Amino acid sequence: MHAFSKIRLTFNQDDPQSHEDDSAGIAVQDAKPTLQAPPMYKVVLFNDDYTPMDFVVEVLEVFFNLNRELATKVMLAVHTEGRAVCGLFTRDIAETKAMQVNQYARESQHPLLCEIEKDG
């Protein structure tokens, strides 16, 4: 993938003039691509009365690569505040992580709920 592409503009086609560099009236300008950062999405875990705290910590370690200490802090935030952000990702990654967590929770017969929200 090239960082720049070339745009050719032709002037005075009816009256060609000679140029020192033999460009025949063709101007070349670098087109700079305009890139924007993709919108980010929060992956949010919600508290429930049935999912064990150890299971929530396991989910945070496995699916969000948090260490034990940080996973425990996030789990306590879920428990005390009713919800907590597990990570900030692009939409595709956030949707995939939320789906994986929800699927794993169902397979483990826990009602843990994970959703995504647009950041900002």
Swiss-Prot record:
Matching HAMAP family: ClpS
Record InterPro entries: ClpS, ClpS_core, Ribosomal_bL12_C/ClpS-like
NCBIfam families: PRK00033.1-2 (NF000669), PRK00033.1-5 (NF000672)
Domain of life: Bacteria
Annotated GO biological process: protein catabolic process; proteolysis
Gene name of the encoded protein: clpS
Organism: Pseudomonas syringae pv. syringae (strain B728a)
Family per similarity comment: Belongs to the ClpS family.
Protein name: ATP-dependent Clp protease adapter protein ClpS
Protein function: Involved in the modulation of the specificity of the ClpAP-mediated ATP-dependent protein degradation.
Assembly mode: Binds to the N-terminal domain of the chaperone ClpA.
